Amino acid sequence: MDFIKIVNEEFKSGKEHPKFNSGDTITVEYRIKEGNKERIQKYRGVVIRISGHGDKKRFTVRKISDGIGVERIFPIESPFIENITVEKYGKVRRAKLYYLRGLTGKKARIKERRVALSSKD
């Protein structure tokens, strides 16, 4: 077996995350280490890009904080990600939503896609 594959298997987080696409509004609970303390920060925003494949897959989340657009890139297999929850499913026709960077207010809104959730009965 290839050495790179062995190392990638060792660092895999093994956590199951829900499926999401570009345009979905998600909340990422991310573990942050500050000095000797550790806390969980929630980062909520719109997924504007999913790139990579396999273990190197990553996604970019954009949110507006105090009128300023902030983007953060998360690796999907990061051991620091505690949880990902999908708040809203967006209805978009593009895979990369870079055009949202130039829009503000109501123009930056994304239509909501209705999804039938299966019950666990």
Curated annotation (Swiss-Prot):
PANTHER family: LARGE RIBOSOMAL SUBUNIT PROTEIN BL19M, RIBOSOMAL PROTEIN L19
Lipid biosynthesis found in the keyword field: no
NCBIfam families: rplS_bact
Keyword Ribonucleoprotein on entry: yes
Protein name (record): Large ribosomal subunit protein bL19
PROSITE patterns recorded: RIBOSOMAL_L19
Recorded name of the encoding gene: rplS
Pfam families with a match to the protein in the record: Ribosomal_L19
Family under the similarity heading: Belongs to the bacterial ribosomal protein bL19 family.
Listed GO biological process terms: translation
A GO cellular component entry from the record: cytosolic large ribosomal subunit
Keyword tags: Ribonucleoprotein, Ribosomal protein
Species whose genome carries this gene: Porphyromonas gingivalis (strain ATCC BAA-308 / W83)
One function term, GO molecular function aspect: structural constituent of ribosome
Functional description taken from the UniProt entry: This protein is located at the 30S-50S ribosomal subunit interface and may play a role in the structure and function of the aminoacyl-tRNA binding site.
HAMAP family the record matches: Ribosomal_bL19
InterPro entries named among the record's database cross-references: Ribosomal_bL19 (IPR001857), Ribosomal_bL19_CS (IPR018257), Ribosomal_bL19_sf (IPR038657), Translation_prot_SH3-like_sf (IPR008991)
